[in-house]
Amino acid sequence: MAAARGRGGQVGTKAKVSLGLPVGAVMNCADNSGAKNLYTIACFGIKGHLSKLPSASIGDMILCSVKKGSPKLRKKVLQAIVIRQRRPWRRRDGVFIYFEDNAGVIANPKGEMKGSQITGPVAKECADIWPKVASNAGSVV
């Protein structure tokens, strides 16, 4: 019998968003956990093809390490949720939207954030999937 595989803290279905953060991308950490930069190591749920880098988008959970920040967080493999990306994507109403930076928040596998507040806006696509992130967001765009 196969082991049951849960979806963690995700709620509902994920909207289709253009992939904007390949493996190796560095993004800002937008919470108050003590990390400054997050280096993308892997993306969850990507099967992949030969010679194609796995990429993440808004609302995806990624595996990352902290490049700048508090010594307690550095040199450890952590999980994070992408909340902003520079690459434009099209919403269902036809509007193209993008942010001025790439940003993520450190979270556990259930989607509960390590920090208690988020600096800057959070994409609506991410807030719909991750309710714990939405509750800590200052503004949802």
From Swiss-Prot:
Keywords from the named record: Ribonucleoprotein, Ribosomal protein
Record-stated family: Belongs to the universal ribosomal protein uL14 family.
Name this polypeptide is given: Large ribosomal subunit protein uL14
Record-level GO cellular component terms: cytosolic large ribosomal subunit
Pfam family, one: Ribosomal_L14
Entry-linked InterPro entries: Ribosomal_uL14, Ribosomal_uL14_CS, Ribosomal_uL14_sf
PANTHER family documented for this protein: 50S/60S RIBOSOMAL PROTEIN L14/L23 (PTHR11761), LARGE RIBOSOMAL SUBUNIT PROTEIN UL14 (PTHR11761:SF8)
A GO BP entry: translation
Native source organism of the sequence: Tetrahymena thermophila (strain SB210)
GO terms, molecular function: large ribosomal subunit rRNA binding; structural constituent of ribosome
